[in-house]
Amino acid sequence: MKKVAVLGAGSWGSVLANLLVENGHQVMLWSRNQAQVDQLNQEHKNPHYMKDFTYNEGLVATSDMQAAVSGAAVILMVIPTKGVRQVAGQLAELLNGVTPAPLLVHATKGLEQNTYKRVSEMLAEEIPAASRRGIVVLSGPSHAEDVAIKDVTAVTAACGDLACAKEIQELFSNHYFRVYTNDDVIGAEFGAALKNIIALGSGALSGLGYHDNARAALITRGLAEIRRLGVAFGADPMTFIGLSGVGDLVVTATSKNSRNWRAGYQLGQGQKLADVVENMGMVIEGVATTKAAYELAQKRHVQMPITAALYRVLYEDEDIKSAIDGLMEREVTSEKE
């Protein structure tokens, strides 16, 4: 049994914490929200995120980060991208001088605005190497709702040090949650972040009344864009046909459980972005990631026409139907381009 600290009590963080408790580990789940902490501890409920799910009574929540991470062998961060640096900064102070250093894992899917950095890069900058044994990315097709009811799920643990990836594989794996290892952190993180862009587009197509052919085309050509950008930064092309690539893309771009798909659907129905964000009440990572990926592609001269079209819809108020027409009216080219 290991002590594991889980930082972030949203849908995914709380369900992963619950899984680890059921795997026999001592888990402390950290949240800033004391009311949420009290409800998790007293009623074993997290209604804002998983209203119908009852958590294992062995799961302990706290608003005290020091209590959560003290003595933890593994620290799992499941924080929205925009909050990663702040939480990592707090964590760095708490880990200063701690031995043995814990293994860090993150399950956040996004790119930092303005710097365009991946989450592992932010963590490496904020938390000194002496305060951590490694940084592992946990990613793949894994809706929290499915894991909560113990549907069969498979994900990837990616780390340049495969021994660290294998440690996380053993920590999380059970009869319904299977973890594979990979050493391609860049590919895993780009796949995890960029699929949210395509999920927005897929939802928008459904909202506009398009059917299976259109969604299949979007997902396939969207994967080509994800691969192009990832490879430009050193990712292994094979990663994008794995769980953290096409696997995560398919589940996020086809399921109504995906908040990015739902947000795109509302946009396709004619709602304004500000209203969609307010209605959702949760972070829609794909909106910010679209901007970051578009700007990154411009800087690296990577062709990402679907991403560019979504950028214009989200940030320049272009009509969605016009954006789709524009994509279809581009000069025809080879599928390999």
Curated annotation (Swiss-Prot):
GO cellular component, one term: cytosol
Recorded catalytic activity of this chain's protein: sn-glycerol 3-phosphate + NAD(+) = dihydroxyacetone phosphate + NADH + H(+); sn-glycerol 3-phosphate + NADP(+) = dihydroxyacetone phosphate + NADPH + H(+)
EC class name: oxidoreductase
Keyword annotations: Cytoplasm, Lipid biosynthesis, Lipid metabolism, NAD, NADP, Nucleotide-binding, Oxidoreductase, Phospholipid biosynthesis, Phospholipid metabolism
Protein residues bound to NADPH: S11, W12, R32, K109, A144, R259, V283, E285
GO biological process, one term: glycerol-3-phosphate biosynthetic process
Pfam families: NAD_Gly3P_dh_C, NAD_Gly3P_dh_N
Binding site for sn-glycerol 3-phosphate: K109, G140, S142, K195, D248, S258, R259, N260
Active-site positions on this chain: K195 (proton acceptor)
UniProt pathway: Membrane lipid metabolism; glycerophospholipid metabolism
Similarity field: Belongs to the NAD-dependent glycerol-3-phosphate dehydrogenase family.
Protein name from the UniProt record: Glycerol-3-phosphate dehydrogenase [NAD(P)+]
Gene: gpsA
